[in-house]
Amino acid sequence: MKTEHAKPLMTPEPNSPPPEDQYTAVSPWREAFKQLKKNKLAIVGLIIITSFILIAIFAPLLTSSSYAETNPSNRLQGPSAEHWFGTDDFGRDIFTRIVYGARLSLQVGFFAVTGALIFGTTLGLIAGYYGRWIDMLISRIFDIMLAFPSILLAIAIVAILGPSLQNALIAIAIVNVPIFGRLVRSKVISLREEEFIMAAKAQGMKNGRIIFHHILPNSLAPIIVQATLGFGTAILEAAALGFLGLGAQAPMPEWGKMLSDSRQFIQSAPWTVLFPGFSIMLVVLGFNMIGDGLRDALDPKMKS
């Protein structure tokens, strides 16, 4: 009968490095990126938005005509080899106007969301961290602004400032400030009593340093998600203001304005309405897909 001998224990040498699979720290941002890559809808949305960004950048290379160039002899011509998306009631090439309109829509989305993000995040940080009467004052202002439908408040602001694309951009930024503000405020309130914040205060760290070095970095996930979703909302609101004649003015190729100018030809020349409307739908859908994917990746608790 064979006797089994116990295998000797392998003790690591004092200076030997730990195994490769031990103490492996995975960055939460890297893990979120991995989850995002697995989300097929988010990838589709990213492809859509990237396509429109490239179209906006290389607009002069995609078409040789001007978006304001008129040709009455080509009035309301259907899609053809010469005019891919047809022409409008002034004989202007709709494809050219769609391409240059992508620039306007993306610029409005970027600047409106950036403005709302900066002011909303700042106010949310102040209200959530300091609390007391400062929080009460800022929160009441947010509540009053959110009591009105965003598009109605934007219309009122543009009516005061005057109809133009710049004023529409300002109005869209203003109506989105409380959305970012309340989001950041709620996140700050949940963080300010955490142990690492209390430890920073105990070490004598100044409030500004605590806010920007500890609280803000830990609040980035919901801010990024809201900013992505806000892009689509801002573009849709700009199109609505343009449709009402309060946004971009002729001859600027803003998609909402194109819809407004062509609504009387919806039966006789449906292409004049179809392509601008389809462009708005695609861009908004693309940003919503990316936003939903980011939300699921950065905050799995919110996954429905």
UniProtKB/Swiss-Prot annotation:
Q: How is the protein disposed in the membrane?
A: Multi-pass membrane protein
Q: Name one Pfam family in it.
A: OppC_N
Arranged from A to Z, the UniProt key words for this protein are: Cell membrane, Membrane, Peptide transport, Protein transport, Transmembrane, Transmembrane helix, Transport
Coiled coil (UniProt feature): none
Q: Which family does it belong to?
A: Belongs to the binding-protein-dependent transport system permease family. OppBC subfamily.
Location of this chain's protein in the cell: Cell membrane
Residue ranges crossing the lipid bilayer per the database entry: 41-61, 108-128, 141-161, 164-184, 227-247, 271-291
Q: Where is the ABC transmembrane type-1 domain?
A: 102-291
| Purpose | Probably part of the ABC transporter Dpp involved in dipeptide transport. Responsible for the translocation of the substrate across the membrane.
Q: Where is this region: Disordered?
A: 1-24
What GO cellular-component annotations does this UniProt entry give?
A: plasma membrane
Q: What protein does this entry describe?
A: Dipeptide transport system permease protein DppC
The GO biological-process annotations, alphabetized, read as: peptide transport; protein transport; transmembrane transport
